């Protein structure tokens, strides 16, 4: 049962990666009412055209905002954030927070080189190149784009063990070349321990989760709190694969079982 006295926050992603952002916000502001919506009908977003992505995010988010009387939206997807934020901010009257790869803080602490681990779409996007140019021009940035890492995070959340040899093979280009790695996809903090194990303790891993949590707190004007855990709602645009296994993990994170949010787009 949601508490009507606290703001409602919508967290949106194409998959379950945004749950890493939810964990950071919820740890800081447990008293809020959280609604999570993932557009798994169009997962992964990196393979969509820009026009299709904008249409899907715009439609699903605005409908959920109306249905649940949302007070703040978090677009917990790097691919969507770089494209759709201006559209949503022009349309909605509530705050919309996006995700940006943590290139700027990484450049402040890297002494060797930075590794940006993201989706192929994020790595190729002009927005990412501009971030590197503006905030890390004096540091070498190694780019690694992988869709398989995204799927590995999805599998882990359904109880499947990660193949560390496969992970090591994917991350091999960054081995012994960097001292800071930016987790540039919200899925990747879900497999942070395994990435750390492969790259070694000498590599510092950073992501945008905590910065997003602080921004949400600032926009809502709410004090950090320790509160009783409550059950939140999670919606999917299509039936999730291995839904029963996923619901087990979702319950541990404070969610009721996945509900359908089926809207033609």
From Swiss-Prot:
Cross-referenced Gene3D superfamilies: 3.40.50.1860
Catalytic activity from the UniProt record: L-glutamate = D-glutamate
Molecular function, one GO term: glutamate racemase activity
Keywords per UniProt: Cell shape, Cell wall biogenesis/degradation, Isomerase, Peptidoglycan synthesis
Known EC number: 5.1.1.3
Pfam families cross-referenced by the UniProt entry: Asp_Glu_race
Pathway annotation: Cell wall biogenesis; peptidoglycan biosynthesis
Residue positions of the active site: 77, 185
GO BP term, pick one: cell wall organization
List of residues binding substrate: 13-14, 45-46, 78-79, 186-187
Superkingdom of source: Bacteria
Protein task: Provides the (R)-glutamate required for cell wall biosynthesis.
HAMAP family: Glu_racemase (MF_00258)
Family as reported in the entry's similarity comment: Belongs to the aspartate/glutamate racemases family.
Protein's name according to its UniProt entry: Glutamate racemase
Organism for this UniProt entry: Vibrio cholerae serotype O1 (strain ATCC 39315 / El Tor Inaba N16961)
């Amino acid at each position: 049962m949601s508490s009507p006295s606290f703001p409602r926050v919508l967290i949106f992603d194409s998959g379950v990666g945004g749950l890493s952002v939810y964990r950071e916000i919820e740890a800081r502001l447990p008293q809020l009412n959280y609604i999570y919506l993932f557009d798994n009908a169009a997962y992964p977003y990196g393979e969509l055209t820009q026009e299709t992505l904008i249409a899907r995010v715009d439609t699903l988010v605005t409908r959920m905002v109306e249905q649940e009387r949302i007070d703040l939206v978090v677009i917990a997807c790097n691919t969507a954030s770089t494209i759709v934020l201006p559209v949503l901010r022009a349309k909605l009257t509530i705050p919309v927070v996006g995700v940006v790869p943590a290139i700027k803080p990484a450049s402040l602490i890297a002494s060797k080189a930075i590794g940006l681990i993201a989706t192929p779409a994020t790595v190729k996007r002009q927005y990412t190149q501009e971030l590197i140019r503006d905030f890390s021009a004096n540091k070498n940035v190694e780019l690694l784009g992988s869709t398989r890492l995204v799927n590995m995070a999805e599998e882990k959340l359904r109880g499947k063990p990660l193949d560390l040899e496969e992970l090591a093979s994917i991350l091999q280009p960054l081995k012994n070349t960097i001292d800071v790695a930016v987790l540039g996809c919200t899925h990747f903090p879900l497999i942070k321990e395994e990435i750390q194990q492969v790259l070694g303790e000498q590599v510092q891993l950073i992501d945008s989760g905590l910065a997003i949590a602080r921004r949400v707190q600032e926009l809502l004007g709410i004090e950090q709190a320790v509160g009783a855990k409550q059950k939140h709602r999670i919606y999917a645009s299509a039936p999730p694969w291995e839904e029963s296994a996923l619901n087990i993990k979702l319950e541990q994170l404070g969610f009721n079982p996945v509900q359908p949010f089926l809207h033609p787009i």
